[in-house]
Every structure is written in C-alpha cells, then in structure tokens.
Amino acid sequence: MTARSGHPILQLDEVVHQRVRLGILAVLAEAEKVDFTHLRDVLGVTDGNLSRHLSVLHEAGYVETHKTFEGRRPRTWIVATKLGRRALADHLAALRELIAQVGEP
C-alpha cells in the first residue's frame, strides 16, 4: 500500500488521466511553453478537441494560455503551471505504484 490513503488507483487524477490531457501535460513537461499548433499536431487532435481539453486543464489550474502576435498572425502558447507539473508528477507516481503492485503478467 501507499503512504497515501488507499489503493494506488484511488490516487489517479481524473483530470490528468484522460489520454489527451495526459499527453498535453507530458509534452509541456519537456518544454517551458508550447505553441497550440505544435501541440495539436503532436497529439493528433483537432483544434476543437484540443481547445476543450485545454479548458478542462485550465479550469483545474494546471495550464495557462498566453496569446501573442507574430506580425499579423495570432499565436497561442500553452504553459504548465506549478500545480499542473505537480499533478503530472503525482499521477505518474501513482501509475508507477499501481504497476509495481500489480506486477508483470
């Protein structure tokens, strides 16, 4: 068992656990900031799908967005917050613990 309460499955963050949101935070863990278009292309999702998942992460306080202009072109940058980076680290720790507890088949 974990020092935290309960089974490791109970420690998984439902906001982070969804595949696209986990991917967003994983990409952001490797960079200080990421352009919306790059993130969309890396994750293989539509603009609308990515926007929706970013909204969920933003509501949880896990990401922030910053809009800039390059010439006349708008550009949206996504940044993981300290809380978002901590949520990803905690989620990955819970996954590791779950895998260790279940073992290999």
Q: Predicted regions: what is each one?
A:
Residues M1-I9, A26, K82-P105:
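Amphipathic alpha-helical dimerization/coiled-coil segments
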Residues P8-N49, T68-V79:
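N-terminal helix-turn-helix DNA-binding core of bacterial DNA-binding proteins
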Residues T65:
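Short beta-strand "wing" residues that participate in macromolecule-binding interfaces
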Residues L54-S55:
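Short, hydrophobic-biased segments on the C-terminal half of alpha helices
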